Amino acid sequence: MSIFETPRLILRPWKEKDEDAEALYKYAKDPAVGPIAGWPPHTSVGHSREVIRALLTYPEVYAVVLKETGEPVGNISLMFSNTAHTADIADNEAEMGYWIGVPYWGQGLIPEAVRRLLQHCFEDLDLQAVWCGYYDGNVRSKRVQEKCGFRFNHTEAGKRSPLGDIRTEHFMKLLRTEWMKDAQ
């Protein structure tokens, strides 16, 4: 699996070791982080370790690591038509998901990570489009997508989230041709 760098971040695979599990728990236990994205807060370091083992070791799943400290403070990932995803995507498309710990909200770190992963999507993976979704009320996620060039595609009401509740999800999409034009 690849490792990517930005001016302030390293995007690298999660490791099944105590340091990564502890860092994941530190930020994923906060009820302001997971539920708005559709997943429950983590309940222990052991729970976070199991999440790493079961979900975060897939290809194209990256810890968002601060270069300055070496600490994972969030996650960014790509999901394809043959893996879990919520958008109706074609074989040459992916869905991107991300989150970052509350202390790092508003610092532009996730847009920095998204832009780097988009470069990977279009230059290395030769994808034709990348999707992102956000639930009603998740204005921070919507703003990240807008800042990174995604455009509104459609809304799906009455969707069951991974938490089991019914929500409205909005989908945005960035085409390779749009990204290439904006990258010039």
PLM regions with names:
Residues 18-25, 45, 49, 53:
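An amphipathic alpha-helix signature
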Residues 53-58, 150:
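Short loop/turn motifs at secondary-structure junctions and domain boundaries
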